[in-house]
A protein has these predicted regions:
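Conserved active-site aspartate in kinases
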Residues: 98
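Short, mixed-charge, low-aromatic patches
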Residues: 26-33, 74-80, 129-134
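A detector for short metal-coordination/catalytic motifs
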Residues: 70, 88-91, 101-186
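The −1 position to Zn-ligating cysteines in a subset of zinc-ribbon hairpins
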Residues: 82, 95, 120
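Charged, low-complexity, helix-prone segments enriched in Lys/Glu/Asp/Gln
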Residues: 26, 33, 37, 64, ...
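Short, charged surface segments at domain edges that flank catalytic/cofactor-binding sites
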Residues: 44-85, 102-114
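Residue-level detector of alpha-helix boundaries and kinks
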Residues: 29, 33, 59-60, 106, ...
Length: 186
């Protein structure tokens, strides 16, 4: 069974082997050559579709965040094993959320800084992670106006919700997070 990389390599190999004959035909412009290459790759990919449709799993190379588990444990310790807002003490339903996203941190110290995170229930984490929720410097929960009242109620986000405490060191990261929330900056 051909693999994706093998099929592409075969296509490239066949295409590059034909380059002298294509040059002899006068087909040397980069646009025509690229068009031919793209057609060859598309044909190779099309030949893989039946095999790919029969498989329900793929093997991938993954770039994993080293330190994510340590960060989660630090969040569990700092927030005493419960949600920073609701107090929910069910670790399986809690997420270690970064105020300044892992990918946006410029150094490892920021990624692992306990003040760059909040232990949040899964529903709060989902909103916080996609910038539909944030927190004011005093810890008050801020929710985007695009989250309808009915959804807020269904998510249990009613009343005066706030972080159980806010350290001065949290405020820099909270300001960064709020700056990413387009609805707060309109």
């Amino acid at each position: 069974m051909p693999t994706l990389s093998g099929a592409i390599w075969s296509s490239i190999g066949g295409w590059t082997a034909e380059m002298p004959s294509r040059a002899a035909d006068g087909n040397t412009s980069s646009g025509l050559a690229m068009t031919a290459f793209v057609a060859d790759v598309q044909a190779a990919l099309a030949s893989l579709e039946p095999a790919a449709a029969k498989n329900t799993e793929v093997q991938r190379t993954v770039r994993q965040r080293v330190g994510q588990q340590a960060f989660r444990q630090a969040m569990l310790d700092y927030w005493q094993g419960s949600c920073a807002v609701t107090g929910l003490a069910l670790p399986q339903a809690l997420k270690a959320s970064h105020a300044k996203a892992w990918a946006l941190c410029t150094e490892d110290a920021e990624r692992l800084d306990v003040f760059n995170g909040f232990l949040l229930s899964a529903n709060l984490d989902a909103l916080f992670d996609c910038y539909l929720a944030s927190f004011a410097d005093d810890g008050a929960l801020l929710i985007a106006p695009t989250v309808p009242p009915a959804a807020r109620e269904q998510l249990g986000l009613t009343g005066d919700l706030r972080l159980r405490w806010v350290a001065a060191q949290h405020r820099l990261y909270l300001a960064f997070h709020r700056a990413q929330c387009a609805w707060l900056n309109e």
